[in-house]
Amino acid sequence: MTNAELFGEGINLMISGMGFVLLFLIVLIYAISFISTLINKYFPEPIPAPVAKPVPSAVPTDNLDHLRPVIAAAIAHHRRQQGLK
Protein backbone atom coordinates (compact mmCIF):
# COMPACT_ATOMS: atom_id res chain seq x y z
CA MET A 1 0.00 0.00 0.00
CA THR A 2 1.19 3.44 -0.82
CA ASN A 3 1.13 6.39 1.51
CA ALA A 4 -1.86 7.90 -0.32
CA GLU A 5 -3.86 4.69 0.09
CA LEU A 6 -2.96 4.50 3.80
CA PHE A 7 -3.92 8.14 4.25
CA GLY A 8 -7.25 7.55 2.48
CA GLU A 9 -7.99 4.50 4.65
CA GLY A 10 -7.12 6.54 7.75
CA ILE A 11 -9.51 9.32 6.75
CA ASN A 12 -12.23 6.77 5.94
CA LEU A 13 -11.74 5.05 9.29
CA MET A 14 -11.73 8.39 11.15
CA ILE A 15 -14.96 9.58 9.52
CA SER A 16 -16.65 6.21 10.10
CA GLY A 17 -15.59 6.23 13.77
CA MET A 18 -16.74 9.80 14.33
CA GLY A 19 -20.06 9.05 12.64
CA PHE A 20 -20.57 5.98 14.81
CA VAL A 21 -19.80 7.96 17.98
CA LEU A 22 -22.18 10.75 16.92
CA LEU A 23 -24.94 8.23 16.20
CA PHE A 24 -24.33 6.52 19.55
CA LEU A 25 -24.51 9.84 21.43
CA ILE A 26 -27.78 10.79 19.70
CA VAL A 27 -29.31 7.41 20.60
CA LEU A 28 -28.04 7.84 24.17
CA ILE A 29 -29.68 11.28 24.47
CA TYR A 30 -33.04 9.93 23.31
CA ALA A 31 -32.76 6.90 25.62
CA ILE A 32 -32.04 9.11 28.65
CA SER A 33 -34.97 11.42 27.81
CA PHE A 34 -37.29 8.43 27.40
CA ILE A 35 -36.21 6.93 30.72
CA SER A 36 -36.63 10.33 32.41
CA THR A 37 -40.17 10.58 31.01
CA LEU A 38 -41.01 7.10 32.27
CA ILE A 39 -39.65 7.81 35.74
CA ASN A 40 -41.58 11.09 35.99
CA LYS A 41 -44.75 9.34 34.79
CA TYR A 42 -44.66 6.46 37.28
CA PHE A 43 -42.86 8.17 40.18
CA PRO A 44 -43.91 11.84 40.19
CA GLU A 45 -42.45 14.18 42.77
CA PRO A 46 -44.91 14.95 45.58
CA ILE A 47 -46.38 18.43 45.59
CA PRO A 48 -45.29 20.22 48.77
CA ALA A 49 -48.06 21.41 51.06
CA PRO A 50 -48.41 25.19 51.16
CA VAL A 51 -46.79 26.71 54.22
CA ALA A 52 -49.00 29.04 56.22
CA LYS A 53 -47.49 32.49 56.60
CA PRO A 54 -47.17 33.67 60.19
CA VAL A 55 -49.56 36.42 61.18
CA PRO A 56 -47.64 39.62 61.93
CA SER A 57 -48.02 40.67 65.53
CA ALA A 58 -49.12 44.15 66.53
CA VAL A 59 -45.97 44.63 68.64
CA PRO A 60 -42.85 45.23 66.55
CA THR A 61 -40.31 42.47 67.00
CA ASP A 62 -37.27 44.61 66.17
CA ASN A 63 -37.53 46.81 69.27
CA LEU A 64 -33.93 47.52 70.21
CA ASP A 65 -34.56 49.90 73.12
CA HIS A 66 -32.95 47.46 75.53
CA LEU A 67 -29.72 47.60 73.49
CA ARG A 68 -29.29 51.38 73.44
CA PRO A 69 -27.62 51.59 76.88
CA VAL A 70 -25.31 48.70 75.97
CA ILE A 71 -24.30 50.36 72.69
CA ALA A 72 -23.78 53.72 74.43
CA ALA A 73 -21.58 52.05 77.08
CA ALA A 74 -19.53 50.28 74.40
CA ILE A 75 -18.98 53.53 72.51
CA ALA A 76 -17.98 55.34 75.72
CA HIS A 77 -15.56 52.56 76.63
CA HIS A 78 -13.99 52.66 73.15
CA ARG A 79 -13.60 56.43 73.28
CA ARG A 80 -11.98 56.21 76.73
CA GLN A 81 -9.52 53.61 75.45
CA GLN A 82 -8.64 55.69 72.40
CA GLY A 83 -8.34 58.90 74.44
CA LEU A 84 -10.98 60.69 72.38
CA LYS A 85 -12.94 62.07 75.37
From Swiss-Prot:
It catalyses: oxaloacetate + 2 Na(+)(in) + H(+) = pyruvate + 2 Na(+)(out) + CO2. InterPro entries: Na_pump_deCOase, OadG. The chain crosses the membrane at residues 15-35. Its EC number is 7.2.4.2. The keyword Secreted does not apply. One of its GO terms (cellular component) is plasma membrane. Keywords: Cell membrane, Ion transport, Membrane, Sodium, Sodium transport, Translocase, Transmembrane, Transmembrane helix, Transport. GO terms for biological process: sodium ion export across plasma membrane. It is an enzyme of class 7 (translocase). GO terms for molecular function: decarboxylation-driven active transmembrane transporter activity; oxaloacetate decarboxylase activity; sodium ion transmembrane transporter activity. The keyword Protein biosynthesis does not apply. Its cofactor is Na(+). It comes from the Bacteria. It is found in: Cell membrane. It is a single-pass membrane protein. Pfam families: OAD_gamma. Belongs to the OadG family. Heterotrimer of an alpha, a beta and a gamma subunit. Catalyzes the decarboxylation of oxaloacetate coupled to Na(+) translocation. This is Probable oxaloacetate decarboxylase gamma chain. It comes from Actinobacillus pleuropneumoniae serotype 5b (strain L20).
